[in-house]
Amino acid sequence: MSSDNSKQDKQIEKTAAQKISKFGSFVAGGLAACIAVTVTNPIELIKIRMQLQGEMSASAAKVYKNPIQGMAVIFKNEGIKGLQKGLNAAYIYQIGLNGSRLGFYEPIRSSLNQLFFPDQEPHKVQSVGVNVFSGAASGIIGAVIGSPLFLVKTRLQSYSEFIKIGEQTHYTGVWNGLVTIFKTEGVKGLFRGIDAAILRTGAGSSVQLPIYNTAKNILVKNDLMKDGPALHLTASTISGLGVAVVMNPWDVILTRIYNQKGDLYKGPIDCLVKTVRIEGVTALYKGFAAQVFRIAPHTIMCLTFMEQTMKLVYSIESRVLGHN
């Protein structure tokens, strides 16, 4: 009995630490994501180039064979700076995307739980349907906000003076990329591939936090682990693998749509059909090793740091706004 009460107290304490404003949630989520992307940006870079190589060709030579070999090739030709291409765009994008995806998930979930389960405490309800919808909804918000930045980031990271993969577009930086796209392609150009971005991010977000929270609850309820960094690490690892499997096909599609400037693809479904028809179904999992190599540590760091940034922001809000 005392063991059950102890578990309940821990859950209540944890929930209280994350009971912050929507703006605070956005800030905490964005901050956690920026810390993570600093480490994982080089892996994102090689993932993009692996996804683009062999585009619309089943027999093209593979310059980048795996993430480690690929990063070694980039380092040899472009140096450390080359491995961190697009980092500034990645920071701004992460604030928009993950600030929304990580920050708005709990407020949306809580509101829906209050609506559908009025007789229960919202933070104690674990409805798969509500969790998945909340994850997808918060992800879609982030995808819309961050789409122009992801577009510029993709083009910055795919460009290389040494090994040309896919369509090459040279921008001097984030602002130059945004201005150039606006001048040449208009507002529509800035939101090129927004439908693919929504599919990609919605798919990944629909499983990221639901898997994370479900894994934590199962591990704690069955006395397999106690709440703390080890639990957060384990649950986020499981979540990262789930995200990689679900998101990779749409990630390939989005990368290709973002990188092309013409009308090679009419939309995400057209790109999906052409990719499978010409390169085979396995093309949808191009760069999967890099995806796992990136998304697993990125998710681990994002979700683990989010636990801490949520508590940090909550403590600041408590002092400034007088939260209980």
From Swiss-Prot:
- In this chain the Solcar repeats are located at 20-111, 126-218, 227-312
Its localization reads: Mitochondrion inner membrane
- Activity control: Inhibited by alpha-keto isocaproate, an intermediate of leucine biosynthesis pathway.
Could you tell me the Gene Ontology terms of the biological process aspect for this record?
isopropylmalate transport; oxaloacetate transport; sulfate transmembrane transport
Is Transmembrane one of the keywords UniProt gives this record? yes
Give me the reactions it catalyses: a dicarboxylate(in) + sulfate(out) = a dicarboxylate(out) + sulfate(in); (2S)-2-isopropylmalate(in) + sulfate(out) = (2S)-2-isopropylmalate(out) + sulfate(in); (2R,3S)-3-isopropylmalate(in) + sulfate(out) = (2R,3S)-3-isopropylmalate(out) + sulfate(in); malonate(in) + sulfate(out) = malonate(out) + sulfate(in)
Q: Where are the transmembrane segments?
A: 26-46, 79-99, 132-152, 193-213, 233-253, 284-305
Kindly give the membrane topology term recorded for this protein.
Multi-pass membrane protein
Arranged from A to Z, the UniProt key words for this protein are: Membrane, Mitochondrion, Mitochondrion inner membrane, Repeat, Transmembrane, Transmembrane helix, Transport
Is Transmembrane helix a UniProt keyword of this protein? yes
Q: Which GO terms describe its cellular component?
A: mitochondrial inner membrane; mitochondrion
What changes when the gene is disrupted?
Auxotrophy due to deficient leucine biosynthesis.
Q: What's one GO MF term for it?
A: sulfate transmembrane transporter activity
Q: Anything further noted? A: Present with 5350 molecules/cell in log phase SD medium.
Describe its function.
Answer: Antiporter that exchanges dicarboxylates and sulfur oxoanions across the inner membrane of mitochondria. Exports alpha-isopropylmalate from mitochondrial matrix to the cytosol, where it serves as a precursor for leucine biosynthesis.
Family to which this protein belongs: Belongs to the mitochondrial carrier (TC 2.A.29) family.
Name of protein: Mitochondrial oxaloacetate transport protein
Q: Which organism is it from?
A: Saccharomyces cerevisiae (strain ATCC 204508 / S288c) (Baker's yeast)
Name of the gene encoding the protein in the UniProt record: OAC1
